[in-house]
Amino acid sequence: ALSSAASDVYKRQKVENVKFEISDYKKVAKSIIITKDGEESSIDLTENDLVFITNGGCVENSSMGSQNTPAVMNTEIKAGGGWDLWRKIAEQDSSFGNPDKFCYDPELTNWMSATVTTLDDRIPPYVQKICKRDPFSGKVVTGGIVTVKDSNWLLSWTFNRQPQFRSQPKGQLVGWIYGLFSNVPGNYVKKPMRDCTGKEICMEWLYHLGVPENQIEELAENSANTIPVMMPYIDAFFMPRNGTDRPKVVPNQAVNFAFLGQFAETERDTIFTTEYSIRTAMVAVYTLLNVDRGVPEVWGSTYDIRDLLNATVKLRDGKPITAVSYTHLT
């Protein structure tokens, strides 16, 4: 889409820095410092150029394991990444935020996820027993996440409408597992989640599904393929902050640049959603280009009992909230 709109896309290049000229009455992005194949160069900018900066990055340093290998926890912030870029930008003006409020301790911001693919018909009945829906129906399955409240890892899992992918083989399910406490031993697998292979994470999940213990390892080995991912900074945007630790989308006196994404400050909205990032981009474009168009307001549903009740009924497949049933696993 960008190429068809006469855009030039530069691949295999790192943006190392954006340099600014700061005065009392305006702030101007003057150059972009890039490296390619180890060689540094710069792109000079004028006030008529526009620079949109995604500062920080929740998925930076993410690593992928496999069915038989753990995902490595890599916490080193390197040049050319979103955190290092933001640090260099923030050094130039206080209005550009404080990235170290968010990325200073990956032990506080990490968690792990895994994609599990069931390969036959042996695991799906355990999923159906909990969610009360046929996961092969082509309709909503879990309707959200299922959290195992007594899990040492605080494990959660979900299966969305299947098939998840067009090329997904018939008879297979693709689901998502994640754990918020990656540094403590599991209830069944007696090792931290971050040290576990995909198979071992699947074993822990199967244990919480209620699979008989004498079947767990064999099912995890032969009836599923599980790929773990470690994300050291995935919760960075939830770290405590004040009103200036994130830069405004368009800082005061900014002439030709804006910040985008989860680490740019907007009014009323809450991070963690795709909508948040999209709204920052709309604010940036409309402001810098003087577009006379309103950004969609944040819907004030937080304390609206009508929205809360409507969402509850939807999650219950239209059943009234008075018709409560409980599932007990023994």
Functional labels for PLM-detected ranges:
Residues A1-A6, Y10, H328-T330:
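Single conserved hydrophobic/aromatic residue that forms the stacking wall/gate
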Residues K11-V28:
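A conserved short coil-to-beta-strand element within the FAD-binding core of flavoproteins
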Residues Q13, K27, T46-E47, N252:
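Structured loop/turn residues at beta-strand edges in well-structured enzyme cores
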Residues K30-I34:
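Short polybasic amphipathic segments
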Residues T35-E39:
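FAD-binding core/adjacent interface of flavoenzyme oxidoreductases
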Residues E40-D49:
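Core beta-strand elements of the Rossmann-like FAD/NAD(P) dinucleotide-binding domain
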Residues N48-N55, E60-Y303:
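C-terminal segments that line or cap access tunnels to active or ligand-binding sites in enzymes
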Residues L289-Y326:
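Active-site-proximal substrate-binding core of FAD-dependent oxidoreductases
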